Amino acid sequence: IGKYIEEHDIDLAIFDDDLTGKQTNILEEEWKVKIVDRTSLILDIFAARAQTAQARTQVELAQLQYLLPRLRGLWSHLERQRGGIGMRGPGEQEIETDRRIVRDKISLLKKKLEKIDQQSITQRKGRGELIRVSLIGYTNVGKSTLMNVLSKSEVFVENKLFATLDTTVRKIVFGTMPFLLSDTVGFIRKLPHHLVESFKSTLDEVHEADILLHVVDISHPQYEDHITAVNQTLLEIKVEQ
């Protein structure tokens, strides 16, 4: 791989699995390119898509939870600065300081999201006894487009992965039956557990739904894999099917 990178003047290598901080550091030093693993790439996409305070808070929490166990490995100069037996070099002291800062920030973000969760619970209670239908599906499958057609409204739509991070709820009247339709974040294969935890308040909309409407793009060559990925994610977030 290193030879291929050098011969083709590549400056970025993306792994479809997660790497430890140490693995990332070793590969970057060996190949002289930036290394991005699967979760890091997904988090970067989420960060670029986050439009509201809630989404930005959820993404930041997931980023910090991803970063915390990788701090040691990401310090490329740590081994050279390590102190002797029973001592700590300056690199290790800085890592401990960074860990405390990250843990404190994680704690603050969790408290902030707890308040958001309570607000979301209050909002759901305020919707009355209407039947709740939640659109689920693989990312970029067309859930928001379907929401716009059914509700005759303009939910943000873009042909990009994870264009929707926040939950949108619309009241729909089908014949004589009114119901609430929600559009949530799209699922993906091997959904990082940091995102599941951070986006709890968003995914709760799926938990609370009376009906799950699984949207599938059968024109996609891998639509069967997408169905499997969505069903697997539902199991991971403990949603009964």
Regions inferred by a protein language model and the residue ranges of each:
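Conserved C-terminal guanine-recognition region of P-loop GTPase G domains, centered on the G4
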Residues: 1-34, 175-177, 199-241
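Conserved Rossmann-like nucleotide-cofactor binding loop
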Residues: 41, 170, 221
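Conserved protein kinase catalytic core
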Residues: 43, 189-190, 223
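Conserved P-loop NTPase architecture
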Residues: 1-133
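Conserved G1/Walker A P-loop phosphate-binding module
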Residues: 74-212, 216
